[in-house]
Amino acid sequence: MNIRIGQGFDSHKLKTKKNSRVFLGGIPVRTDQQLIANSDGDVVLHALSDAVLGCGSFGDIGMYFDENDLSNKGLDSKTILNYCLKLIKKLKLEFVNIDLTIFAQDIRIDPIRFEIKSSLMKLTGCNSVNVKAKSYEEPKNEIACSCVVLMNTNK
């Protein structure tokens, strides 16, 4: 058995914008805040993607999706995750579990926790996903996610 651990982290600033939405784990969330990001700014999928890349020793998402590349403007983060999953598939690695923590102050995670979990299970095929939430004391105009992934293979 070959066991791999990957860790990922992402954060984005928020600015006030009435009747806006952010994406968390591929789920659109209505809010009065807007993410400042080049892609769709999904901190959950970005942290997960980096953790997946870590399991394969493939670097980080910035190596594959340059933030200065205009073709990545508004990019759906599911595209990023799917690219990372294809890299991992070459190593025949399979998920054991995904454990992540979302840090946010004004965006309430609890009402959408199970929707995020379900989305991640569907996107990754992993049936052991844990989503935790913590409030940010400061800065309040930021959202972040930390993610740890455990994978294994019998090669």
Swiss-Prot record:
Binding site for a divalent metal cation: D10, H12, H46
Cofactor note text: Binds 1 divalent metal cation per subunit.
Marked site positions, Transition state stabilizer: N38, S135
InterPro entries (UniProt xref): MECDP_synthase (IPR003526), MECDP_synthase_CS (IPR020555), MECDP_synthase_sf (IPR036571)
SUPFAM superfamilies listed in its UniProt record: IpsF-like
Binding site for 4-CDP-2-C-methyl-D-erythritol 2-phosphate: D10, S11, H12, D60, I61, G62, F65, D66, E67, N68, D69, K140
Keyword annotations: Isoprene biosynthesis, Lyase, Metal-binding
MF (Gene Ontology): 2-C-methyl-D-erythritol 2,4-cyclodiphosphate synthase activity; metal ion binding
Biological or metabolic pathway of the protein: Isoprenoid biosynthesis; isopentenyl diphosphate biosynthesis via DXP pathway; isopentenyl diphosphate from 1-deoxy-D-xylulose 5-phosphate: step 4/6
EC number: 4.6.1.12
Cofactor(s) annotated in UniProt: a divalent metal cation
The keyword Metal-binding is annotated on this UniProt entry: yes
Any one biological process term the GO annotation gives: isopentenyl diphosphate biosynthetic process, methylerythritol 4-phosphate pathway
The keyword Ribosomal protein is assigned to this record: no
Catalysed reactions, semicolon-separated: 4-CDP-2-C-methyl-D-erythritol 2-phosphate = 2-C-methyl-D-erythritol 2,4-cyclic diphosphate + CMP
Enzyme kind, highest EC tier: lyase
Self-association and partners: Homotrimer.
UniProt similarity note: Belongs to the IspF family.
Cited NCBIfam families: ispF (TIGR00151)
Function: Involved in the biosynthesis of isopentenyl diphosphate (IPP) and dimethylallyl diphosphate (DMAPP), two major building blocks of isoprenoid compounds. Catalyzes the conversion of 4-diphosphocytidyl-2-C-methyl-D-erythritol 2-phosphate (CDP-ME2P) to 2-C-methyl-D-erythritol 2,4-cyclodiphosphate (ME-CPP) with a corresponding release of cytidine 5-monophosphate (CMP).
Protein name: 2-C-methyl-D-erythritol 2,4-cyclodiphosphate synthase
